[in-house]
């Protein structure tokens, strides 16, 4: 009965999450530029000036909170790359004067899409890394129905279109409703990606609140994956 109540509550939350997520997906599919606006600069304690900008569109879905939208940044030479929690990907090399990011077409929705987003706002993309001319994205993968883990997709870096392929996907998963501790949350999922040399990256994986998995040497959860 508790599981049924949880499903009902999550369903109502999912409807709200779905509306926001679909709006962002529609923007991604439009391939429109991501507009930015100038915000008030911030003077730091060392007398340096921090220039602030606001993303005016494209980033709508939050991961921890519903709003504002969440995202990730990285650099590729002179280009600043941005990625939203729902797969809006763009770049700019002159954002002070250009005031927009050009979108990069991608197939992220092949791996995670509205079907997953409506189940909880924290089922999302988790990190972005540009490393050795490759682009890496981690995300919440629904391995089986309502059973999750954190995975990585990768591709050659390209500024027109990117065709991601799976780099890492675990065989095991943590069930959203049927798990040993009877507690689950998609936020403590890990997902951080770091390049450690020219041939390797490291991924963090979280326990999804099944904390005992971090102590289980046979489990990939709560670990660093190379």
Model regions and ranges:
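Intrinsic disorder/low-complexity segments enriched in polar/small residues
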Residues: 6-7, 25
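Acidic, Gly/Ser/Thr-rich repeat motifs that build Ca2+-stabilized beta-propeller blades
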Residues: 14, 18-212
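A detector of repeated loop/turn-to-beta-strand junctions in beta-rich toroidal repeat architectures
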Residues: 149, 214, 218-221
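Extracytoplasmic, non-cytosolic globular domains
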Residues: 223-225
């Amino acid at each position: 009965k508790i599981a049924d109540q949880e499903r009902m509550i999550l369903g109502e939350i999912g409807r709200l999450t779905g509306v926001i997520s679909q709006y962002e997906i529609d923007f991604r599919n439009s391939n429109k530029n991501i507009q930015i606006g100038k915000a008030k600069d911030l003077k730091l304690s060392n007398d340096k000036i921090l220039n602030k900008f606001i993303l005016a569109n494209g980033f709508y879905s939050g991961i921890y909170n519903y709003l504002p939208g969440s995202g990730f940044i990285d650099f590729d030479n002179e280009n600043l790359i941005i990625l939203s929690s729902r797969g809006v990907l763009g770049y700019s090399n002159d954002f002070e004067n250009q005031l927009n990011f050009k979108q990069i077409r991608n197939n992220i929705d092949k791996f995670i899409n509205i079907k997953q987003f409506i189940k909880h706002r924290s089922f999302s993309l988790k990190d972005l890394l540009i490393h050795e001319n490759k682009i890496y994205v981690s995300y919440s993968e629904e391995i089986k129905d309502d059973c999750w883990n954190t995975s990585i997709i990768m591709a050659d870096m390209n500024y027109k279109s990117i065709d991601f392929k799976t780099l890492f996907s675990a065989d095991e998963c943590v069930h959203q409703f049927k798990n040993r501790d009877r507690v689950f949350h998609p936020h403590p999922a890990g997902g951080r990606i770091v390049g450690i040399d020219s041939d390797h990256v490291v991924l963090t994986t979280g326990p999804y609140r099944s904390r005992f998995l971090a102590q289980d040497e046979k489990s990939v959860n709560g670990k660093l994956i190379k």
